[in-house]
Every structure is written in structure tokens, then in C-alpha cells.
């Protein structure tokens, strides 16, 4: 008797494409690809995954948390992976913000990209004695604090001239913003300015003309000129009653580097700053996070890796993910197909 290996006959051959012989019939294959179905997003196995910046801050958007809105302040858990669930973050209280004038919408997503995020325990500037003062720190009834009194964002101080002696127009003033974070962290410093109609500008600041503002840090300089009256509606902020508007921006200060802000009337001086370190991988997705998954995929949500490759929609993914391929892949685990002997004789 003779045993021949490598070729056999079968009634159910499979076709595989090979690099050297093109299409070849074989007796058995193992599928290497899967086509996922869309599912909910999940926590990434083996690591901490961040959904909302502050999970315990109820009724707060991520921008509320990033700006330090009263009643929206809490611990931001560390995370190696983060879900970008608000593509266009907005705030829903405190003061109408002219979102599209600056990069303020990007602030929550900037923070989300860090593994460790904390708010400083003390203020970076003494707002009451800053150049152009003395000032009182303005508050808003639409921004209640924890005792339901008038409040404002923890990251900024609304610097209103304290008395008639300094409630006048001023040439540009400059304040240095020191670096107060530690442990090699980046410092994210939030600042801004307030403007109103001409009547309110004179009442608050003694000057009804547009005001100029400049920030500079880490080689990046930004200039603004305030708008006086004629503001757009702020429907996305819930129709807040204030006649004025604020513009909010931020600057990133690297370890040990001082920043500067040059301003006129209506400045929102930086107060508490964000100290952030490490990197968190960010992917677009949705909440809530349900269960765990090997992989987070922007189009399919949470995936468990059942095969090494996948077909379907190609998109960003993080974790232990299958590799995208255009067409299904198969591994031949059988022998090369040989037609039955009877068929060979008929030829």
C-alpha cells in the first residue's frame, strides 16, 4: 500500500487565492475574518475608560466641568482611554458664551486627551489686585453656587472695577500667569472677557468702546477685539437672561513656562487652572458604556476579537482590535483538492 499526502478527493472543495498559484481548490479552510455588527460602546478590557469627564457631576455637560461651573465640580478619574461623546460640546448655564469666536468648544476634548486631570487648589492670580484694579469679582444669578447664592466659573474671575475712581477707560494692561502645576504636568489656563451693550459697558467699566485682549503662552499668541451689542441669540445656552456675552479661551503652558494676558475692561482673569499629565487614547463614541470589550471601534462600538481580521467599515479603533481588510481571508487547513477517480477517467 502507498499513502499519498497533499492531494485528496472530496465532494465539498473550497477555493482560496494564493500568492504563487492563484485560485486553488482545497478540502478545508478556517475563516480569518468577521464582519462586525454595531453595538453599544463599552469599557476597554484591561484599562480604565473615561466617558463623561466627571461621572458624579449630575446635569452637567463636559464644558460645564471644564469651565468649573458651580455644582459641576468634582474629581475627574484617571483613564488610559476616553470616549469623545460630545462632538460639539456646549454649556447650559451660568452665562451666555459666544462659542464660535474661540476654540472654547475644544477644551473638554483637550482635557480628555490626558490620562490624569486635576483642578488646582488655589488661584493662579489675585484678581482683586490685578493691574487696573482694585476689582470686585462679578457673579451671576444664573450661576448659583453650592449654597444657591450668585456665583461664577471657578476657572475665571470677572474683574469689575470696584469704584468710580477706576471705572474708566484704560490702555492695555498686562498680567503674568505663573506656572503653578507640579510633577511635569501641562497647565491649561482658562481666561476670557465680557462685553455688553454701550449702556451696560459704561455702567460697569466706564468705557463703551470695543476692548482689546491678547494671550500668549508656549509660542502661541491670540488676539481679540470685543463686540459691543448686537449679539446673536444663545439658544444653545437655554435662553439665559443676560444682555451681555462672554468669550472664553484657554492657553496651554508647558512645565515652568509663564504666560501673559494683555487686556482692557471686561477681562475674565484666570483663577483655578487644570494640571494634566499622561496620555489617554481618544475615540469618538457614545454613552453609556456597557460591559467590557477587547476593542472600541468608531463605527461598530465595543468589539470582542473573535477573528484576527475584519471586513466592513474602516474607522479608528483602539484596544486589542482585529485588522481591517478589504476582502475575507481564509487559512487552508485541508489538502489540495483532487477530482474523484471516476471523473478523471471520463476526461
UniProtKB/Swiss-Prot annotation:
Regarding the membrane, this protein is recorded as: Single-pass type I membrane protein
List GO terms (cellular component aspect). Answer: host cell plasma membrane; membrane; viral envelope; virion membrane
| Primary localization | virion
Q: Where in the cell is it found?
A: Virion membrane; Host apical cell membrane
Q: Does the keyword Glycoprotein apply?
A: yes
Which example biological process does GO assign this protein? symbiont entry into host cell
Describe the PTM. In natural infection, inactive HA is matured into HA1 and HA2 outside the cell by one or more trypsin-like, arginine-specific endoprotease secreted by the bronchial epithelial cells. One identified protease that may be involved in this process is secreted in lungs by club cells. Palmitoylated.
Cleavable signal peptide = none
**Which GO terms of the molecular function aspect are on file?**
host cell surface receptor binding
SUBUNIT field: Homotrimer of disulfide-linked HA1-HA2.
Q: Recite the other comments.
A: Major glycoprotein, comprises over 80% of the envelope proteins present in virus particle.
Q: What is the protein name stated in its UniProt record?
A: Hemagglutinin
